Amino acid sequence: MTRGLRRFHHSAQTHFITFSCYRREPRFSSPPVYDLFLGCLEDMRRRFSLCIYGYVVMPEHVHLLVNEPPCATVADAVHYLKLSFAKRVQSLVMAGSGSFWQKRYYDRNVRDAEEFKVKLGYVHRNPVSGDW
């Protein structure tokens, strides 16, 4: 999360979230790592009663478009996702090779239907527009 910015949490708010792998290294380059992340994403969705409107997992970063959890904050949900995945991936493939994630993440409140459409389009186009 960006330092110094005030966060506004509202139960009806949609959030566009981006977080990156440590040093922007392409750590999602193998199917087992990708599949493990999808399992953790589903765990987060259930635990926090989130609606995931869209997501994309790129080789070195992730974008999510989600609602504000009814009984927690987006920060709580992202923390849970990143921590639970990091613990599981360490035991699966990393074998103590250090951090998986950058420490912070980007969270933008989606203010209206037009911005929602733009952000969802960005999520859908990200794999196509990147050099992958």
Predicted feature residues:
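Short catalytic/metal-binding and nucleic-acid-binding patches
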Residues: 1-132
